UniProtKB/Swiss-Prot annotation:
Transmembrane segments: none annotated. It comes from Rickettsia typhi (strain ATCC VR-144 / Wilmington). GO terms for molecular function: aspartate kinase activity; ATP binding. It is an enzyme of class 2 (transferase). The keyword Transferase applies. One of its GO terms (biological process) is homoserine biosynthetic process. It catalyses: L-aspartate + ATP = 4-phospho-L-aspartate + ADP. This is Aspartokinase. Its EC number is 2.7.2.4. The gene is lysC. GO terms for cellular component: cytosol.
């Protein structure tokens, strides 16, 4: 018996007819003797309507206003969860809609872009024991002040990934309007091929680069907790879709959710909280103050390591006739590798970071360009280095960047360039500051 999380997006629940068509998809998984937990989005277009309504009555420039904004936006998923539960019940399948406060899904206080700290799974486990299918309203959580929070766009994908991690699910299936991940957008490239299987990191790059099938936050979470994810079509339920997986099944964060889950069970045992055996007990939740006795965070930013590279060359070019792309093409022509590209002044000055070993080659190349009056001047700077912090949840955690910049300001470190992704932040600094920066950031984040 496997535990499958099924998430249905906005187009999959766009109207009553489509909601009814989800019943056989869910039932098919049950007939395989699998347990199922469902996460739903709002019906297509509903969230946009709610955003418009909020903007018509509020400027949304106060924290208190964003708290109410979250309440309004969360209603879309709540309606969908109830409608799908009704559709399943109509077919004699036991189902119950569940909201964030009922589990609870505990978050920080960042309204409209909350990060999840802890999910209490007792209620979900009880539903599964009683063969009741939980239908969870996605996109939302609850903070320690008992206020509704939302996760931002793509939040239902995030809910599904988090529930999969909390429940140690065997797989998380994302149902949408396309039958998998393609080599390019099929609307632009009609002969684009569906990818049968893709690695977590490759999928994270695609999602971060604009592929809208999955939200990068959800991909980062299943990669972090090593949970297989499938992208499937609601409208072509018999297709294979795309499997997002890794051959290594060891969770990348061994001591976060696994440890906090056991701690929560100890809290529950020590406070003698009982879960009733009948279905009326499905309003049970672990008190928030107990769950937060230890500071848990399922989406906490984890820094796994810090690296540096001094083997770099900064090239500054003042052009006369060459465009940005022409200069970049010229530099890469003889196998010179560009790591950073930056336009300083429109069509006038550009900066490139490349390998220090390319200096002599570039000296000859750019001198010829200057003699041919293609560029006005160029300079080299060898006193540069990069510092990279590698981990998880980096782009989602606003406090991370704040902590780094505060530390660098305190240390009088000048940052020339910066790049962020879901799994890495890279800073370009003076090479004389490398050791000091590494030491202080290492201690700041207690990397071990």
């Amino acid at each position: 018996m496997a535990l499958i999380i099924q998430k249905f997006g906005g187009t999959s629940v766009a109207n009553i007819e489509r909601i009814k068509k989800l019943v056989p998809i869910i039932k098919a998984e049950i007939t395989k003797n699998n347990q199922v937990i469902v996460v739903v989005s709002a019906m297509a277009g509903v969230t946009n309507q709610l955003v418009t309504l909020c903007s018509e009555v509020s400027s949304l420039n106060k924290i208190s206003q964003f708290a109410e904004y979250d309440v309004a936006l969360s209603s879309g998923e709540i309606v969908t969860a109830a409608l799908l539960a009704l559709a399943l019940q109509e077919e004699e399948i036991q189902a119950q809609s569940l909201l964030a406060w009922q589990l609870p899904i505990l978050t920080n206080n960042n309204h409209s872009k909350a990060l999840v700290e802890f999910i209490t799974t007792d209620l979900l486990e009880k539903c599964l024991q009683l063969k009741i299918i939980p239908i969870i309203a996605g996109f939302q959580g609850i903070n320690k002040s008992n206020r509704i929070t939302t996760f931002g766009r793509g939040g239902s994908d995030t809910t599904a990934a988090l529930i999969a991690a909390a429940m140690k699910a065997d797989r998380c299936d994302i149902y949408t309007d396309v039958d998998g991940i393609f080599t390019a957008d099929p609307r632009i490239i009609p002969n684009a091929k569906r990818i049968k299987e893709i690695d977590f990191l490759e999928m994270l790059e695609l999602a971060s680069s604009g592929a809208k099938v999955l939200h990068p936050r959800a991909v980062e979470l299943v990669m972090r907790y090593k949970i297989d994810m499938r992208v499937l079509s609601t409208f072509l339920p018999n297709t294979e879709g795309t499997l997002i997986t890794s051959k290594d099944t060891t969770p990348l964060v061994k001591s976060t959710y696994m440890d906090m889950e056991e701690s929560a069970k100890n809290i529950k045992r020590s406070t003698k909280i009982n879960i009733p055996d009948d279905t009326s007990g499905l309003t049970y939740k672990l008190p928030i103050e107990l769950a937060l006795q230890n500071r848990y965070n399922m989406e906490n930013c984890i820094i796994r390591g810090i690296t540096s590279n001094k083997n770099l060359l900064k090239v500054s070019v003042n052009t006369i006739t060459l465009s940005f792309l022409q200069v970049a093409n010229m530099i890469t022509y003889n196998n010179n590798c560009i790591e950073f590209m930056q336009e300083i002044k429109n069509n006038i000055e550009y900066n490139f970071i490349t390998n220090l070993t390319d200096k002599n080659n570039l000296q000859t190349l750019l001198t010829n360009c200057k003699n041919n009056k293609q560029i006005q001047n160029f300079t080299f700077d060898t006193e540069i280095a990069t510092i990279s912090l590698i981990g998880y949840g980096i782009k989602n955690d606003c406090k991370l960047l704040e902590m780094i910049l505060s530390q660098l300001t305190q240390d009088n470190i000048n940052v020339n360039m910066m790049q962020l992704s879901e799994v890495k932040i890279t800073l370009l600094i003076n090479d004389k500051d490398v050791e000091k920066t590494i030491s202080n950031l290492y201690n700041l984040f207690k990397i071990s």
